[in-house]
Amino acid sequence: MSNYVVDNKRRLAELREVRKQQEPHAYTTILMQDLREDFKSIEEPILDRESGITVKESNDKELVVLLSDWHIGYQFKDSKTGGYNFEILKERIQHFVNKTVKEILERDIRNVTIYFVGDLIEHVSMRNVNQAFDTEFTLSEQITKGTRLLIDVIQQISDVTDGNLTFGMIGGNHDRLQGNKNEKIYNDNVAYIVLDTLINLQELELFNGIEIIDNRDDVYTIEDQVCVKNIIVNHGDTLKGNVNHIPKFIKDQVFDILITGHVHHLKVKQEDYTRQHITVGSTIGYNTYSKELNLSRTAPSQQLLFLEPNSDDIELKTVYL
């Protein structure tokens, strides 16, 4: 075989290797050149910027104030978190109310709904070991202090609400009057006592300007509607597992939002379609119970929910205490 043939084949092989290495870069160069030419031809925006934009004359959003798990009467000491007692609770609630009032005024909110989502009190005899050891007050004192604190919160929010103010509450597992859950009487709950007191005050014209949701026939659940959204409120102590819980409450209507408490930390879960399950925080936060079970060191919090008619969007604001 002649040297010419060998040299020619070698050159061809080298050229093939060079082309093989350069080919991907050539495609990239062609792509970038084409993109530059395409961008030069864009004269108008792709999006129709005027579509769907309307200027509202006034704010039609409504506010839902979410309160839960105050556990009035419970106390513990902790050098890192500051512990918890009734005085600390009052400071945290006042901080939350101040934030709520500010949001109402700045956003020009007219209509407000307040839900208390259970466990107003701590109780004194829910455990075989003496629960009263960790409490500041008797059961009756816990109930009266809880009622007065709720009235104070409602009145402060009422003072800055120009439209409708609605209040509703449900009972939690700590609110049952019987300590042993296996011996409880259905509806025999602190929430009934508080609701009945507030309604009686209204009848005596001592607590006016507030619409109270009267669910005394079943204090464990509220079914309500805000901004054309069906809302169900339940403490959540009977809801187990990380599954969709809204279908469990559907009977003759579908609910858009499920609001629960009980677990003492904020959690938001999207269920089917645009349905939301919102778990409200607690004013306690991390405590000795959390420490024993190696649970998360959650900060105390309560939530504000902003809803808008004719929109599936929700805005949830967490106020850390």
Language-model regions: role of each:
Residues D188-Y192, N200-L206, I213-D218, N230-L321:
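Conserved beta-sheet core of the metallophosphoesterase superfamily
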Residues Y74-F76, S125, N242, N287-T288:
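Short helix/loop capping segments that flank catalytic or ligand/cofactor-binding pockets
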Residues M1-R107, A299-Q302, F306-N310, E315-L321:
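Basic, amphipathic N-terminal segments that precede the first structured/catalytic domain
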Residues L165-G168, G209, D218:
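Domain-scale recognition of functional cores that engage charged ligands
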Residues E50-W70, G82-L201:
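Core catalytic region of metal-dependent phosphoesterases/phosphodiesterases
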Residues Q155-G163, Q225, F249-D252, K269-D272:
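Short, surface-exposed basic-aromatic patches at helix termini and helix-loop junctions that form
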Residues D78, K181-I185, S290-E292:
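Short, solvent-exposed loop/turn segments at secondary-structure boundaries
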Residues V55-V64, E223-I232, D272-R275:
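Beta-strand-turn-beta hairpins that frame and shape the catalytic cleft
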